Amino acid sequence: MTQDKCPFKEQSSQPNFAGGGTSNKDWWPDRLKLNILRQHTAVSNPLDADFDYAAAFNSLDYEGLKKDLRALMTDSQDWWPADFGHYGGLFIRMAWHSAGTYRVFDGRGGAGQGQQRFAPLNSWPDNVSLDKARRLLWPIKQKYGNKISWADLLILTGNVALESMGFKTFGFAGGRPDTWEADEATYWGRETTWLGNDARYAKGFSGSDKRGSLIADEESHKTTHSRELETPLAAAHMGLIYVNPEGPDGNPDPVAAAHDIRDTFGRMAMNDEETVALIAGGHTFGKTHGAAPADNVGKEPEAAGLEAQGLGWANKHGSGKGPHTITSGLEVTWTKTPTQWNNNFLEYLFKFEWELTKSPAGAHQWVAKNADEIIPDAYDASKKHKPTMLTTDLSLRFDPAYEKIARRFLEHPDQFADAFARAWFKLTHRDMGPRARYLGPEVPSEVLIWQDPIPAVNHPLVDASDIAALKDEILASGVPPRSFISTAWAAASTFRGSDKRGGANGARIRLAPQRDWEVNNQPWLREALSALEAVQSRFNARGDSKKVSLADLIVLAGCAAVEKAAQDAGHPIKVPFVPGRMDASQEETDVQSFNHMEPFADGFRNFAKGPARPRAEHYLVDKAQLLNLSAPEMTVLVGGLRVLNTNYDGSTHGVFTSRPGALTNDFFVHLLDMNTAWKDVGNGELFEGSDRKTGGKKWTATRADLVFGSNAELRAIAEVYASNDGDMKFVKDFVAAWNKVMNLDRFDLKGKQTIPARL
């Protein structure tokens, strides 16, 4: 009897296994990315279903953890030695690069999910050697287990690093539950080579196949002073956090580099003062690494062999570590005290004149002219070096606006320290959302405008009888129910699960800039707000101490209108409502910051701005992902909002019903009706449905409507709601999804912190 051979060919590269082979994405690369609505669910989470991260964090020996982190800073390991005997610079970079991927346009990126552990971030060229930083932390993470998430630990370690080198931080807040899989929703750009930027800029670079090195370009590029970065990106190159430290596309021009710095830092919510503080403060510590050319550097973690165990960038130069380390290809130590907080960076920036040179790896950098060798070597106490700087460091001197700030910081170290402390806190907490999510003993008491503050509840809340009476009064106001539904949706759907901003709490729908957004139907909005303000005034004028906020009334009115719509459809149902929202003031609202949240498109309301944009159905899925919705939840909400007649402009596109305003499943029934034939009547954006026999016009629709009959997966869901037994299920599911959206920002109600479920 012969021995059976393994069906898998030895060392075969043929992916003839589950998940291998040519995929749907390969055949149809432009297909709708519904997979982003199936991420970060209980299926991928190894923790128990009832695990409460907030409770776990609050039981943490916080001071013991910080003590262990402080000890680690100077506990140099042979397998990855500490520069200058202190890991502070490495851990500051780790925390900075964890948080620094955040961008204002969609709130994605940032430190909130610990995504630096996963592809692509774990293998970005800008994150070389951070794999070692996280492994240095593993014994501490192992000790404290699930009481501290990786997401929180990466940031706290950066704080402790600063404190261990004499800097007083502004504070720290925990509250970042981990995710357990690589994020597929964030758009990082279209380039297919590391360090490329030829897709995000009209005239960019094609990139490089080198590892552990940036691009050096001798040529001058006129467009770098005025080029415009693709939205929503906030990095100048694929695989970089912000900008190329050698200068734009490797061109060592500090003035041109300032343009890229201002653009990218601005897209991360930083103004000029915060930008100068972060660069000067961060570069007070540590060094860069470029001991030899990039040819010595091996594959990144995602491409390295199994034996590397998740580490990457193996370096064959010398020992491959310590004095032989290659990270960026730059070899710069900014100050003579790289493990102490002081003003040396700014002092040297203005004290010396600088001349262009190259690192041992061939990267552009600058060296002080006619300067003494005052900079210590990271590993040899007998060696000294001349001061060195990056091109982007010199931008703080040669850009007029940056120079003014930098000189003020030089002359007023106290202002510099305060600005850096605040900017660092903002950098590392910008994507955490409201203060209600903050955990731990070091949460600063000062309320900051970028936290989108909302006053605390300071009065008794309405009870069940009050709610019933208020609903009756609202529905008797004479305002069409669709105005209340539209206003409630407009308020609540500003929420972004990415950075936890937006939502109905605060009633900012009545304030600038939201009240003026094109997507928010102005007549309907004014009509609804006017009626609700009158209801609020009458209720709050009563003799008792109970009060109702406008934010609560906006949501309550939407709920009441949905209940009426369900009743009119023959399916009475109670829509849940929990009071406790408060009203923010205009002074508590950063208009510029909220402007970034104005949608280019909102398929839930059939809104799309301008022709130069992705297709409406892709924006619809993007919006659904930001709302933490599943594909079924997105589907049922669109179908319900259409029959409720809530298109932003009052149009009838997608209103496939003879009973607009009633919460029926008519949208799905008529969309899937094979007696209707569809044709394009608006350049692929508008469609007309006609009777197949008579040719008579029946409906009009947008891409955000027809996708539910066109896309195979969405059609499968639509069929459930279009079936004869699907009408009541449709109403129940719509109410559940509606309630979810209305409460996405109610962190005050959520007794535990988890990744929001998509059901």
Swiss-Prot record:
Keywords: Cytoplasm, Heme, Hydrogen peroxide, Iron, Metal-binding, Oxidoreductase, Peroxidase. Sensitive to heat and heavy metals. InterPro entries: Catalase_peroxidase, Haem_peroxidase, Haem_peroxidase_sf, Peroxidases_AS, Peroxidases_heam-ligand_BS. There is a cross-link at residues 242-268 (Tryptophyl-tyrosyl-methioninium (Tyr-Met) (with W-96)). The active site is at 97 (proton acceptor). GO terms for molecular function: catalase activity; heme binding; metal ion binding; peroxidase activity. Monomer. Belongs to the peroxidase family. Peroxidase/catalase subfamily. This is Catalase-peroxidase. The gene is katG.
